[in-house]
A protein has these predicted regions:
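Active-site-adjacent beta->alpha loops and helix N-cap segments on the catalytic face
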Residues: 101-104, 162-175, 196-197, 212-228, ...
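Catalytic alpha/beta core domains of metabolic enzymes, predominantly
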Residues: 227-326
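Intrinsic, low-complexity polybasic segments
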Residues: 2-4, 9, 14-15
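Glycine-rich, proline-tolerant flexible connector loops at the mouths of alpha/beta enzymes
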Residues: 153-171, 328-340
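Non-catalytic terminal accessory/regulatory regions of metabolic enzymes
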Residues: 17-124, 367, 372-376
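Catalytic beta/alpha-barrel core
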Residues: 31, 169, 186-196, 206-218, ...
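Alpha-helix-loop-beta-strand connector modules within alpha/beta enzyme cores
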Residues: 167-189, 224-230, 279-293, 339-361
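Active-site mouth loops of central-metabolism enzymes
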Residues: 122-139, 162-167, 187-191, 212, ...
Length: 377
């Protein structure tokens, strides 16, 4: 990670600084032997030009993306500075999420726990579509925790197609999930559907989910970018890969770099499943971006008997995590019952996922109650 340099977000021996030149995004790569003073001078120069810096630490270098272009900058302005090795043009429309800026995979860490997203360990998120009652939530939490999930999902706010459908328990649901974190040690991931709900979700959850319907809610994306909680961004039902990455760019451009993506199926002509799960997106994202990517086979298929097979496939193709809906009584669920697994089915899914994870060089780390001390609120 390196030692922070005053006047610059962070630094190491080899540093990249990015800046937009004549409408284009540039990377300024420092020489390996560049001093902290030289790094600081480049950062200060960029700040004087009216840009905003975004530190992207990596194993071999730290990249500082610069946004907020207020005018043209001649490439030579930075090339001639002491310690600068080269200036590289980035042509992609998305900048901060691009591997051109950060070569290493982003790993999201959570205070007070060993749980991570994006590392060698496979992140497992499980729980009901919606928090319906304290009894229901704890019944599911006990089972998914025992099976090995590190993260608990549950909707306190539910964006529904019909205004007459169950809309969630709101803050009361968030309080129940906070109790579950305390009891079982699982980190909490739940959806914010607008700026108002995001304020409350940030108070209770460890990670904020932005759902498919809000993937291009740019006001909400920017608000999440100004927050301090990691964000799980789901792909829109008809979004292209570039549109998906550009949505993530909105969040990073506001200063929140702890973002994970989630493929949850797209709308096609097929009618044998609720959506068509696009597993080809996983390697495509990993080639273009440093952000971790989940797969949600529950929404991706909409059918219980398809969830486990597609979970196996997602792990095999290289997904960094799974998001699976589990309900103690799916036939009585207030939402998404047909795609929710019974707890026994989730147990079997985890057994199979561990086997496949080992084949592709991944593990499924455990998380316990002992790790709840110091967990961020």
């Amino acid at each position: 990670m390196g030692t922070a340099v005053p006047g610059c977000p962070s630094s190491v021996a080899r540093l990249s600084v990015s800046v937009r030149s004549r409408g284009e995004f540039m990377l300024v790569v420092m020489k390996a032997q560049a001093t902290e003073e030289q790094v600081r001078a480049v950062c200060q120069k960029i700040e004087k030009l009216g840009y905003r810096s975004h530190a992207m630490p990596g194993a071999q270098r730290t990249a500082i993306g610069v946004t907020g272009n207020k005018g043209e900058v001649e490439q030579g302005t930075l090339e001639e500075m002491p310690g600068v090795q080269e200036v590289i043009k980035v042509s992609k429309p998305y900048k901060l999420v691009s591997r051109d800026l950060k070569e290493d995979n982003t790993v999201i860490r959570f205070p007070g726990t060993s749980a991570t997203i994006g590392g060698r360990g496979l992140a497992i998120v499980a729980g009901p579509c919606a928090i319906e009652s304290r009894e229901q939530a704890f019944a599911v939490a006990e089972r998914v925790h025992h099976a090995g999930a590190q993260f608990f999902r549950g909707g306190a706010y539910k964006p529904r197609t019909s205004p007459y459908s169950f809309q969630g328990m709101g803050e009361e649901g968030l309080k129940i999930m906070a109790e579950i974190r305390q009891q079982y040690g699982m980190k909490i991931i739940t959806e914010a559907i607008d700026n108002e709900s995001l304020d409350l979700v940030e108070e209770y959850a460890d990670m904020v989910q932005i759902g498919a319907r809000n993937m291009q809610n740019f006001s909400l994306l920017k608000r999440a970018g100004r927050g301090k909680k990691p964000v799980l961004l789901k792909r829109g039902m008809s979004a292209t890969l570039e549109e998906f990455l550009m949505a993530a760019e909105y969040i990073l451009s506001e200063g929140n770099y702890n973002v994970a993506l989630c493929e949850r199926g797209v709308r096609t002509f097929a009618d044998h499943t609720r959506n068509t799960l696009d597993l080809s997106l996983v390697p495509a994202v990993q080639r273009l971006s440093h952000l971790p990517i989940f797969v949600d086979p529950s929404h991706g298929t909409g059918k219980r008997n398809k969830v486990t097979p597609l979970s196996r496939a997602a792990v095999a193709v290289g997904a960094d995590g799974l998001m699976v809906e589990v309900h103690n009584k799916p036939d009585e669920a207030l939402s998404d019952g047909p795609q929710s697994l019974f707890p026994d089915q989730f147990d079997e899914l985890m057994t199979q996922v561990r086997q496949i994870a080992a084949v592709v060089g991944r593990t499924v780390p455990e998380i316990g109650v002992r790790e709840t001390v110091g967990a961020s609120q």
